A protein has these predicted regions:
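Basic, often amphipathic N-terminal segments
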Residues: 3-99, 107, 119-180, 193-207
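Generic recognition of long tandem-repeat/solenoid scaffolds
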Residues: 114-117
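Short strand-connecting beta-turns/loops that link adjacent beta-strands
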Residues: 110, 189-190
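Short beta-strand segments and strand-loop junctions that repeat across beta-rich extracellular domains
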Residues: 180-189
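Short, basic/glycine-rich phosphate-binding loops at helix/coil junctions
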Residues: 106-112
């Protein structure tokens, strides 16, 4: 394992291994089966604001930080090799760090409440560059024509509860962020996600 984060279950909290995300296009594939990895942008600047809501409303709270997913599913954990790592490192080094803001609350049906990043273009471009380099791994298995960048705040809770949370959250927007790295994550046998590799943005090697 590489990196300083290991997202273990917090005491007194039950984890769900059936973490189905629902989009406006229909249900997305289950995340966290143990056979696939994920590439994410962590959004640590949002945690002080969204942690309390995620703890109550998001089943993945105990196993993942606040984040925006770039690509899932990605390679099986057993396929995370040095050659794959180097390819990702070189690809992401050509993408400069960027500012963004979480300024709007969005919904996938009544099941998922999320924060939408603005601008969304850098996240879309990152996903496009990664999938161009790894065409066997389209976002969500190629299930959708468009994948919307988002930070999940609540999933699967009662509608009234999530609507109330959205009203409270609105007072704290926008939340400003700065994307500096991409994390390659994979689930451990115990169910929590671990950082396998870190890829800084914008560090092109000079000859």
């Amino acid at each position: 394992m590489s990196g300083r984060w290991s997202f273990r279950p917090r005491r007194h909290e039950r984890l769900s291994r059936d973490e189905t995300i629902v989009s406006r296009h229909g249900p997305l594939p289950e995340m966290g089966s143990g056979t696939e990895s994920s590439l994410i942008v962590p959004v640590l600047s949002a945690e002080d604001i969204v942690d309390g809501l995620r703890r109550r409303l998001d089943p993945s709270y105990a196993t993942m930080p606040a984040h925006i997913t770039l690509l899932y599913p990605f390679v099986p954990p057993s396929s995370i090799s040095e050659s794959l790592t180097e390819k990702l490192r070189e690809l992401l080094a050509h993408f400069e760090p960027f500012d963004f803001a979480l300024s709007e609350i969005g919904w996938f049906g009544d099941q998922v409440m999320y924060l939408a990043p603005s601008p969304r273009a850098p996240f879309v471009e990152l996903t496009s560059r990664i999938t161009a380099g790894f065409p066997d791994y389209p976002p969500y298995g190629g299930a959708f024509d468009e994948v919307v960048p988002h930070l999940v705040v609540g999933e699967g809770a009662r509608r009234a509860r999530m609507r109330g949370a959205a009203r409270r959250l609105q007072r704290y927007l926008p939340i400003h962020g700065f994307a500096t790295e991409v994390l390659l994550m994979s689930p451990s046998p115990s169910g929590h996600w671990e950082v396998r590799r870190r890829f800084p943005l914008g560090r092109v090697r000079r000859q």
